[in-house]
Regions:
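Secondary-structure end/capping motifs
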Residues: 260-334
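N-terminal export signals
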Residues: 30-48
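Secretory targeting signals
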Residues: 1-26
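Sec-exported extracytoplasmic/periplasmic mature domains
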Residues: 72, 98, 117, 175, ...
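Pocket-lining segment of extracytoplasmic ligand-binding domains
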Residues: 110, 194-291
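Short, glycine-/small- and polar/acidic-enriched structural segments
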Residues: 49-180, 186-187, 205-211, 228-232
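Conserved C-terminal helix/tail region of periplasmic/extracytoplasmic solute-binding proteins
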Residues: 325-352
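Short, solvent-exposed loop/beta-turn-alpha elements that line the ligand-binding surface or hinge
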Residues: 78-80, 144, 238-246, 313-321
Length: 352
């Protein structure tokens, strides 16, 4: 088994995680927005590694489970045996992509744009996460505290990670709606669990939470005798604002051009495997949650509840090119550094 292999078990979600009986504090870099995150290098158990195996990497959040499903159920492994590993931080991902240690990985979609604009020979293959973010709010008299962005602007809100994906998405949506985000009552935390604690304590009215943290919030609130809800679906808000499907092209599988040249048959089979994995996860949420719970520091119950709201996908990036470029354009307008100084051209997208 790889030196990266770890199994994580969560015992206390009030801002700490328990890992092999050792307490580790969440750190900002170890959690990816879209998305939200786990902390430490992990390896999903597919096959014993050997020098000839390929390695597919993923973030420490639920979409990486699709790689594990594909490894167990799919046909690509019969063409080239492969191992699935989890990068523990954006820094590890970037270093691996730059030094060649990582040639195939699920990445935040803006990372693909940034690398491409730096002149790196990479292609965005597909979109595997269409967004995981929700606005949690209390319920009073059968109604959620907020029902629109305009409502949200009148209440206090906690967001994990200042100037990271959840924050950036909301800033763009406020701007599109003609709302002044700088005037909003926003608090930031260094970790998602801290945002959850702040919200459940009643110190803020609402919280911007990714799955499966949103589902965990619902479970914890119920334990405390409180009623909360997914008051706003950030993906739905994005679709309405930009006249697209109710999704955000948050993360996808990236390949280096060298990997593509050497593994064309494998990639074609993997494409079908991942599409099948999406369907399998929807048909088998409990089994998917059981698999995810072995590697992500969340209770299986929260994972099972959150997976149906996690918007897994395996959409070819080139097939929604315009939608992704719109996403990049908005990110670039907010902060040009996010996309590497410019909006990438269509050469970023993989085409067979």
């Amino acid at each position: 088994m790889s030196r990266f292999t770890r199994k994580y078990r969560a015992r206390d979600y009030n801002a700490i995680l328990i890992c092999n009986r050792r307490t580790i504090m969440l750190k900002r870099r170890d959690f990816i927005a879209s998305t939200s995150a786990a902390f430490a290098a992990l390896s999903l158990p597919t096959r014993a590694q050997n020098a000839k195996q390929l390695t597919l990497w993923g973030p420490p959040v639920t979409p990486s489970v699709l790689l594990a499903i594909a490894a167990q159920e799919g046909k690509a492994k019969d063409i080239s045996p492969f191992d699935v590993q989890i990068w523990r931080s954006p820094d590890q991902l970037r270093a691996g992509l730059l030094n060649g240690d990582i040639a195939a990985s699920i990445v935040p979609s803006y990372v693909a744009a940034n690398l491409y604009n730096q002149g790196k020979k990479v292609k965005l293959f597909n979109i595997m996460s269409e967004g995981l973010n929700y606005i949690a709010a209390p319920v009073a008299n059968g109604k959620p505290l907020v029902a629109s962005l305009a409502d949200l602007a009148q209440h206090s809100l906690v967001i994990p990670f200042k100037n990271d994906m959840p924050d950036l998405l909301l800033q763009i949506l406020y701007k599109k709606a003609g709302l002044d985000f700088s005037a909003a009552q926003v608090s930031y935390t260094a970790t998602p669990p801290e945002a959850l604690v702040l919200f459940l304590s009643g110190k803020v009215d609402c919280a911007n939470l990714p799955e499966p943290l949103m589902s965990l919030a619902l479970l914890k609130a119920k334990e405390k005798g409180k009623e909360i809800t997914r008051a706003l679906d950030v993906q739905q808000l994005w679709g309405e604002a930009f006249n697209t499907a109710a999704r955000v092209p948050l993360a996808g599988l990236l390949f280096t051009e060298e990997f593509i040249a050497q593994n064309s048959a494998f990639i074609a089979a993997l494409d079908e495997d991942l599409k099948a994995a999406v369907a399998w996860s929807k048909a088998n949420p409990e089994k998917t949650a059981e698999l995810a719970a072995k590697y992500l520091p969340f209770p299986q119950e929260a994972l099972a509840a959150g997976i149906p709201h996690s918007r897994f996908s395996a959409i070819p990036a080139a097939s929604i090119e315009a939608e992704i470029l719109t996403f990049y354009t908005e990110m670039h307008a907010l902060n040009a550094k996010i996309t590497g100084g410019k909006v990438p051209d269509a050469g970023l997208f993989y085409r067979a």
